[in-house]
Amino acid sequence: MAQQTVVVLNGPNLNLLGTREPQIYGRQTLDEIHGQIRARAGELGLEIVDCFQSNHEGALIDRLHEKDFDAAIVNAGGLTHTSVSLRDALLAVNRPFVEVHLTDPSTREPFRKVNFLADVAIASIVGHGVRGYTEALELLAERFKRRA
């Protein structure tokens, strides 16, 4: 069986991890997190085709449209609460994805209770901090194994 591939998408402001509200999001940078994701993926026999971050909705959608992956891990940041277009793109590419959030948005400001992605994701991992990304990889690896 060919190695299963995963793309990791991070939305607006996640490039500021490590400095943006560290009391909420922690002190690890996005590059450090991407390193942990790549290391764990290797241990699980998965290939990370890209760890992509953009502050622009259209760039995230364009990356999805490349369809060069078997599954995705998506931390859409604030777009979670506003982007019908990102939801539509995730549905259009017809690849399973796990939604990840470092915090639990539903326990924060009222506007964060709206979520356009959770009901179309195969799972949502929220409030587990950086560990949520590796948990998403483990979930995808198990899913791939069951379907092999």
Each language-model region and where it sits:
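Glycine- and acidic-residue-enriched helix-capping/strand-helix junction motifs
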Residues: 17-31
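Extreme N-terminal starter segment of soluble prokaryotic enzymes
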Residues: 2-6
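Short beta->alpha junction loops
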Residues: 49-58
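Short, electropositive alpha-helical surface patch
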Residues: 59-76
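Short, glycine-/small-residue-rich phosphate/pyrophosphate-handling segment
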Residues: 98, 107-148
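Short, hinge-like loop/turn segments at secondary-structure boundaries
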Residues: 67-68, 91-92, 114-119
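Mid-chain, well-packed structural core segment of small domains
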Residues: 71-106
